[in-house]
Amino acid sequence: MTTVWKVLRTGREGVLSSAVVWPPLGLLYMVDGEWLRERWDGVFAFADAAQAREFADGLKPSCEIWKCEAESVHDVSHVLATYSLRWAVTGAHDKWLGLIRAGKLSSAREYARKAGFAQCYAPYGTVLCDGLRFIEEVST
């Protein structure tokens, strides 16, 4: 297992959601010790606590940083457009994600562009995890 850091926004009544809010990708999170697996294309997190802090500093005061345990961490930090919408192109999603997981990032970026995937941009230091489990809050 690998340690990663997840930045979450704090909403009304303590509801936690993804920090990169781009409808319809504003996912809600339950911090209950259970594994999150395969939400959309995986779960975004930060490989380094300092990078998570830098990103969170731009969101204050409405965020929390959580230390997490991660499964199958894929480094996508040098690819800006890293997220496709699952429903963008039927069947194309699996090919795109396969290219990311195989480390063929330039091919994945070109494939997404040609397939017309809707994209949002992941911050520097982002990793894509197949599974994520929240361990403890390290900062608010």
Which positions does each model-derived feature cover?
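Conserved NAD+-utilizing ADP-ribose enzyme module
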Residues: 1-30, 35-41, 49-140
